[in-house]
Amino acid sequence: MKIPKEGDFITIQSYKHDGNLHRTWRDTMVLKTNENSIIGVNDHTLVTESDDRRWVTREPAIVYFHKKFWFNIIAMIREEGVSYYCNLASPFVLDNEALKYIDYDLDVKVFKDGEKKLLDVEEYERHRRKMHYPKEIDHILKENVKILVDWINNEKGPFSKEYVEIWYNRYHQLKK
């Protein structure tokens, strides 16, 4: 797939380590791309689960994917403030079908008051054993949790105060 440009719509697919499709987001609008990252927005986006259940995202969310970091970041924009959901996941790849990554179960939730919570540790451990995650991936993921927490604590990148405002405003300009 050629690198999508600003205003294009793409599909996002998350997989599990065993290669099974986990979840699909249809029609994510691309806000910015470069050789290493993609910033997009989901706003009332159709999501299809692996068991074919479907739902639509409730609020706008700015999404951030990187080719070098083992996480992606979703900034959920709500009336009461911005909260974040961060997936520990492989760096993304693009092909003719979609932006794709492997979801490794561990998640970090950042509440609007700044509180952080590591989620799904038991699910990660269960899948690590069941799907035989290599020790190298286990190590990489744990190191990337540290990098992610550092970004959160230092308001780096998607966690900066200006980031969500800048990209949400850009979304409104593009959708006109």
Swiss-Prot record:
The reaction(s) this protein catalyses: a ribonucleoside 5'-triphosphate + H2O = a ribonucleoside 5'-diphosphate + phosphate + H(+); a ribonucleoside 5'-diphosphate + H2O = a ribonucleoside 5'-phosphate + phosphate + H(+)
UniProt binding sites for Mg(2+) 2: D105, D107, D120, E123
TM helices/strands, residue ranges: none
Family annotation (Pfam families): DUF402
Record: active site: R23
Superkingdom, taxonomy of origin: Bacteria
Keyword tags: Hydrolase, Magnesium, Metal-binding
EC assignment: 3.6.1.15, 3.6.1.6
InterPro entries the UniProt entry points to: DUF402, FomD-like_sf, Ntdp-like, SA1684
Amino-acid positions noted as binding Mg(2+) 1 in the UniProt annotation, renumbered to this chain: N87, D103, D107
Enzyme class: hydrolase
Alphabetized GO MF terms: magnesium ion binding; nucleoside diphosphate phosphatase activity; ribonucleoside triphosphate phosphatase activity
Classification via SUPFAM superfamilies: FomD-like
The protein's required cofactors: Mg(2+)
Family, similarity comment: Belongs to the Ntdp family.
PANTHER family: PTHR39159, UPF0374 PROTEIN YGAC (PTHR39159:SF1)
Function as written in the Swiss-Prot or TrEMBL entry: Has nucleoside phosphatase activity towards nucleoside triphosphates and nucleoside diphosphates.
Name recorded for this polypeptide: Nucleoside triphosphate/diphosphate phosphatase
Organism, as annotated: Lactococcus lactis subsp. lactis (strain IL1403)
Taxon lineage: Bacteria, Bacillati, Bacillota, Bacilli, Lactobacillales
Gene name of the encoded protein: yjjG
